[in-house]
């Protein structure tokens, strides 16, 4: 594959996530009915984001915790020139201590444990077991896109980085699927088919399979993304991303359909956005969305630095 194509998709992955996250904030936590009420003509631009108590905490065009935490991982890869699990955990904790805006409850509970930075995976396991092994939130899959941009050991690294906060096998499987999809797109110009994704899912948890099934054969609406009780479930987010991967005809079409579905829209659009960015390349992300990001130039510098590791 041409280096230019790899670079296009590499940049597309990170910008695709950040744009999806920033645009998804517009409908985060809304029901489909509320989305239709606040955005009767859809949404085309960050300037249209309604300013209620939740959304006004961010400036328009800013991304949220999803991309903040993904950048903690990226910064660690660049600083250490390798995967250093404890360094990533330290950066997560530092981000949390410096405000950590938008942090999920589960992630906060794990990182609030006293010895988190010295044994993060143990902390994640403790909190998971305390919750009777029921919690499978989307706080790890939301940041895993960058792991797919590593040259090798993608599955193993996705597992280990996921377990820094989320120990449940549904979370781990979600991260491995997303990272593997991105890696195959960027470095091999290859789309994983239904059987391959099912094969990865079955290695981690059988409960992933019905969600893969659903989005492969049905539309996005079958996921009920705005379901109040389960909108933060890792398998709903994975499902939305897989729907975009297999069915969306462009970055813009896929992202807008997910954003206008409401629910945990910033996370759903962040993960789907990373995959669509990897599939179509940065040039196919609308220019006004890329340039409209509050920290577009900072993001560009960070990605260039990470990409330079491969030269």
Put a short name on every predicted segment.
Residues 1-311:
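Structured, active/binding-site neighborhoods that engage oxygen-rich ligands
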């Amino acid at each position: 594959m041409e280096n230019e194509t790899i670079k296009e998709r590499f940049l597309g992955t990170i910008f695709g996530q950040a744009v999806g996250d920033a645009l998804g904030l517009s409908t985060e936590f809304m029901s489909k009915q509320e989305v239709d009420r606040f955005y009767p003509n859809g949404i085309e631009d960050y300037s249209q984001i309604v300013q209620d108590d939740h959304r006004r905490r961010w400036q328009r065009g800013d991304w949220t915790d999803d991309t903040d935490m993904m950048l903690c991982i990226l910064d660690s890869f660049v600083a250490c020139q390798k995967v250093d699990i404890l360094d990533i955990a330290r950066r997560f904790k530092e981000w949390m201590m410096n405000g950590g805006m938008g942090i999920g409850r589960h992630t906060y509970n794990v990182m609030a444990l006293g010895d988190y930075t010295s044994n993060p995976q143990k902390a994640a396991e403790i909190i998971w077991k305390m919750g009777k092994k029921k919690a499978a939130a989307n706080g790890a899959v939301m940041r895993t896109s960058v792991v797919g941009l590593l040259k090798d050991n993608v599955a193993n690294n996705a597992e280990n980085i996921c377990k820094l906060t989320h120990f449940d096998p549904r979370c781990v499987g979600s991260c491995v699927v997303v990272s593997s999809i991105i890696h195959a797109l960027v470095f091999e110009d290859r789309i994983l088919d239904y059987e391959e994704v099912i094969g990865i899912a079955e290695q981690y948890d059988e409960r992933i399979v019905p969600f893969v099934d659903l989005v492969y054969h049905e539309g996005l609406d079958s996921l009920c993304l705005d379901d109040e009780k389960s909108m933060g479930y890792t398998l709903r987010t994975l499902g939305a991303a897989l729907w975009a991967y297999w069915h969306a005809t462009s970055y813009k079409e896929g992202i807008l359909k997910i954003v206008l579905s409401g629910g945990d829209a910033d996370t759903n659009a962040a993960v789907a956005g990373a995959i669509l960015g990897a599939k179509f390349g940065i040039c196919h992300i609308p220019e006004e969305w890329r340039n409209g990001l509050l920290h577009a130039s900072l993001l560009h510098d960070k990605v260039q630095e990470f990409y330079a590791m491969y030269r």
